[in-house]
Structure formats: C-alpha cells, structure tokens
A protein has these predicted regions:
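Noncatalytic alpha-helical scaffold of FAD-dependent oxidoreductases
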Residues: 1-452
Length: 452
C-alpha cells in the first residue's frame, strides 16, 4: 500500500492522496446511503496529464480505478468493490468563456451544473439540461451517465448538448475531439462513444457544451388529476404547445409531503399532479389556458407567470427526492415506459410491491413526456425480491430499466432485461478493446457473468 501511495503521490503530490479510513468509507458510500464499497486511496488530480499518469500507475500495478465526480448518482455507479483507487475529478474545475457566436462553452469534468448555468446566464444564454442536484452534480458525471432531467422534453439529454470532449483512455492515451463546425462527417462520432459509457471506456476531462437562447416569457402551471391516465393524456395534449419546457408527473402523496416540508402554499388533495412549463419569445399564457380548458382538470390549476411563483411551484417538485429520503434510504427505480403502458405498469407495480412488501409505500414522480418515471419505495424490507419483480414488470410492459440514472453497479446484473445478448456482447467487445484488463470502473454496467 505504501508503494502505491508513493507512486500516486509522485504524480499529484502527497496532499492530494488520501488513505484515511473514515474519508474512504464516506467516499465509498453512494448518495442513497444503501450501498457501500471499499477503496484503498482517493486521488485528486489537477489536469489531464495527471489523470493519464495516474491511470498508467494503476494499470501497471493491476489496481482497479473508480472515477468519481459529484457523487450524486443513484445506482452505485461510483461505489468501489475491489479496494479501488478513487479518482476524483473535482479539481478539473476550469470553465471557459462563452462563445456567443457559436453558442458554446467548454467546461472541465469537475465543473458543477450550477456553474455552467451561471456562466451561460451571465452571457445571456442558457444550458438546456437541468436537474435538482445541480449544485453538486458535475459535468463529467452527467456526460458519463447521459443525464436527462427536468427539460428533456424540449432540449434532450446530455447527448444532445455535447459538441466535443476530451477523454483519457484506459491506456493513458488522451483523445480530444472538438470540431468547430456543426457539419462534420469525417469518421466516427467519437464523443458519442463516451456519452453514457459511465466511465468504463475512459475518464472524461472536459466537455464542449451547446448553449441556447433564453426565451422571453415563461408560464408554469400545477394541475391536479384523479387518475394517472388523465395525467398521461393531458401530457399528450400539452406537448403540442410551442415551447413546452417541462411536463413533470407528481404523486399526490409525495406532493403533500413536499408541501409540508417546505411549508409552502401549493395545491394538494388530488391523487396525481402535472407540473407544466412553457417558455417562448411570445407570451404563451393564452395558448396554455386554451389547452387547459380543453383538458378540463377537476380543479382550477395553479398558474405562475412570474419568477417567484414559478420558483415556488418548482420547489415542491425538486424536493421530492429529499423528502422521500427523510423516511430512510428508499428503493429507487428509474425506468422509461411507453406512454400507453405507464398507467397499467404503475397499477401492476403497486400490486407487486404490496404483495412482496405489504408495509412498503410507493411514491412516484418523473418526466411524463418521455415516460420516464422515478418510483421510490419507502420502508421496503424485501428489497432484492421487490427490485427484480418490478424490473421484470418494466420489461414486460415494453420499457427499459435505466432511463437517465445509468446502470451503475446496481443494475449490472439486470442489463439483460433491457438489452439483447448481442447488444451486451458488442458493448463488452468495445470495453475489452479499450480496457483489456478491465480495471477502469470494473463494478459498473456489465453483468458478473461476463467477468467470471
């Protein structure tokens, strides 16, 4: 261990190598608190060259490496399992100037999402992806998981925002792909290879991101419904609006908990809610009102046309994860279902949970336009049984088991519920080509059967 520590310190300096047991335990536990691994050291490199050197040190010694960003993931994607070296990207925090003409900005892997939003706003632009953990989630991790979030219906996932990137491959080679023109058909779209690869194919060190114009007007509405199918149908109608920014599904019980937690005056009392936001160069209030009248919700919607009102409504949505966490670490699902199957899946999943764990409480929220749901099960003692049963239901209803959180280590042995054997074999062939010793993010994505 001392030899490894000294070799790591030769690269980054002794102050940036940590072997304290308490620190390593904290850094080896994921955000949910459900999953803890084991690591032998934490290193915090300053730049791409140091990352390349660190990877060479670890690879040559046969030491696994787990890459960590903001550690906001929910599928144990940064939890080490093999006494790994933890490689943190937190010091890769440089952020470039906004290129107004091209609508782009370059951010280091350790830059937080909030910092990108701030830099874009200062230049009169915006970044299209947003998530509740924006203050701690980092760009490198968001690219590696192809994060989505609150505005995917309009702007897409991280894949749609990446114009170029720099990555250190498992062999220490650095690849920089940063075309300055939008029309570029010269060879493979290499950046796409690392978007969503969850650190298994290399360490993303910086990213060129697309920025957008800020719409002049914004209207936010919280609408109550009696059934989930009503929410789905309302989402279909509202999605036809020009400039729809968000269509968020909220479980009525969760909204009540959020309202109490925030001590906020938001509508409650209905089983289901839809948080809709529209922004455009023209005032969309009249268009939204017309569609709401056509939908005919059972109670008058709350509508906000100013920033404070919008912030109040969004606060209730954004604290959902925090609120459900107050009852202990929930069992979390992140799945996408065809819209036609969303309501029936929810009914079936609720029944399965009730039969496997009668004392458990399911709370649902998500992004209804994409059929992306976050099912949180509170007080669930039979977690393993419930987990597989619900994921099998996802498959049976035509969905996928990982919509935006990634596979991580939590879902690696359920990958066959979403992908064919040939899909997995092709991905594994790419992994083996770039990382033949399988030392980088070894616990992530691929089923145990491939590794034994």
């Amino acid at each position: 261990v001392d030899g490894l520590r000294n070799a790591l310190a030769d690269v980054v300096g002794h102050r940036f190598v940590v072997t304290d047991a308490d620190v390593l335990t904290t850094r080896s536990t994921d955000q949910t608190g459900r999953y803890t691994g084991r690591a032998c050291a934490l290193v915090r490199p300053a730049d791409t060259a140091e990352i390349a050197a660190l990877l060479n040190v670890c690879r040559s010694r046969g030491v696994p490496v787990t890459v960590q960003g903001g550690r906001t993931g929910l599928v144990a994607g940064t939890v080490p399992e093999h006494d790994d070296v933890l490689l943190s990207t937190e010091r890769l925090a440089a952020i470039g100037d906004v290129d107004l003409a091209a609508g782009r900005i370059t951010a280091g892997a350790g830059v937080t999402l909030a910092q990108v939003h701030s830099a874009a706003a200062a230049a009169g632009l915006k970044f299209g992806v947003d998530i509740a953990s924006r203050d701690t989630a980092t760009i490198g991790g968001m690219v590696s998981t192809n994060a989505g979030g609150l505005h995917t219906v309009r702007y897409g996932n991280m894949a749609e925002q990446v114009l170029g990137l720099e990555v250190v491959l498992p062999d220490g080679t650095t690849v920089r792909r940063s075309p300055k023109v939008l029309s570029d058909n010269s060879g493979y779209n290499l950046p796409a290879l690392w978007v969503g690869s969850e650190g298994t194919l290399g360490v993303v060190t910086s990213v060129d991101l697309k920025l957008r114009k800020i719409p002049t007007y914004r209207v936010t509405s919280l609408i109550g419904f009696d059934t989930l199918q009503d929410v789905v149908e309302a989402g279909r109608v509202l999605r036809t609006l020009d400039g729809v920014d968000a269509l968020e599904l909220l479980d009525g019980r969760g909204l009540e908990l959020a309202a109490r937690h925030l001590k906020a005056a938001v509508p409650t009392g209905r089983p289901w809610y839809l948080l809709a936001e529209v922004s455009a160069a023209h005032d969309p209030l009249e268009d939204l009102a017309e569609l709401l009248e056509r939908i005919g919700p059972p109670q008058t919607p709350a509508v906000a046309v100013d920033a404070p009102g919008s912030t109040r409504l969004w606060a209730a949505r954004e604290c959902f994860a925090e609120v459900v966490g107050l009852f202990g670490p929930p069992l979390k699902f992140d799945a996408a279902l065809p819209l036609d199957s969303l309501a029936t899946f929810t009914e079936d999943a609720t029944a399965v949970i009730a039969s496997r764990a009668p004392e458990a409480i399911p709370i649902l929220f998500g992004h209804v336009a994409e059929g992306n749901i976050h099912l949180n099960v509170l007080n669930c003692p039979n977690a393993d049984t419930v987990y597989r049963s619900v994921l099998e239901l996802v498959r049976d209803h035509g969905g996928n088991v990982s919509s935006e959180h990634g596979v991580g280590s939590l879902k690696r042995n359920y990958l066959d519920l979403a992908l064919s054997a040939q899909d997995i074999a092709t991905m594994w062939a790419i992994k083996r080509a770039l990382d033949p010793s399988d030392y980088l993010n070894r616990a992530v994505m691929f089923p145990d059967a491939l590794r034994h």
